[in-house]
């Protein structure tokens, strides 16, 4: 028996590196679609509208139509940013 540690072959294989890069790129694409689709999807489907009384803000049309009185109450008491943030999520309506 020898007291020397075993020699390990550390050969760099370019095929594995390219495959790993492709898998990482695909994973980033899936990650991006998963987290960005809820933001981009409803606006492209036409479910969003300009927030009344809050210039520059966009809110979910279905949520606003379900309870416009609540929107205007929040707009008067807490301001445009709070009202738009409350009515921004379209997942509540679906």
UniProtKB/Swiss-Prot annotation:
UniProt PTM comment: Possible proteolysis of the C-terminal region from the predicted transmembrane domain to permit secretion and transport of the mature protein to the cell walls of the nucellus, allowing the spreading from the egg cell apparatus to the micropylar opening of the ovule.
Highest taxon in the source lineage: Eukaryota
Tissue-specificity statement: Expressed only in the egg apparatus, consisting of the egg cell and two synergids. Not detected in the central cell, antipodals, and nucellar and integumental cells.
Keywords: Fertilization, Membrane, Signal-anchor, Transmembrane, Transmembrane helix
Localisation: Membrane
Membrane topology field: Single-pass type II membrane protein
Residues on Extracellular side: 37-94
GO annotations of cellular component type: membrane
Upregulation: Rapid down-regulation and/or degradation after fertilization.
Stretches that traverse the bilayer: 16-36
Parts of the chain on the Cytoplasmic side: 1-15
PANTHER family linked to this entry: ERYTHROCYTE MEMBRANE PROTEIN 1-LIKE, PROTEIN EGG APPARATUS-1
UniProt function note: Involved in short-range signaling required for pollen tube attraction by the female gametophyte. Required for female fertility.
Record's protein name: Protein EGG APPARATUS-1
Species this chain originates from: Zea mays (Maize)
Lineage of the organism: Eukaryota, Viridiplantae, Streptophyta, Embryophyta, Tracheophyta
């Amino acid at each position: 028996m020898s007291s020397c540690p075993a020699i390990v072959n550390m050969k760099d294989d370019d095929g594995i590196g390219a495959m790993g890069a492709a898998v990482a790129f695909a994973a980033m694409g899936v990650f991006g679609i998963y987290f960005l689709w809820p933001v981009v999807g409803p606006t492209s489907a036409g479910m969003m509208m300009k927030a009344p009384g809050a210039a520059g803000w966009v809110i979910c049309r279905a949520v606003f139509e379900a309870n416009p009185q609540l929107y205007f109450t929040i707009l008067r008491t807490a301001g445009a940013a709070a009202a738009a943030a409350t009515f921004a999520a379209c997942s509540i309506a679906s």
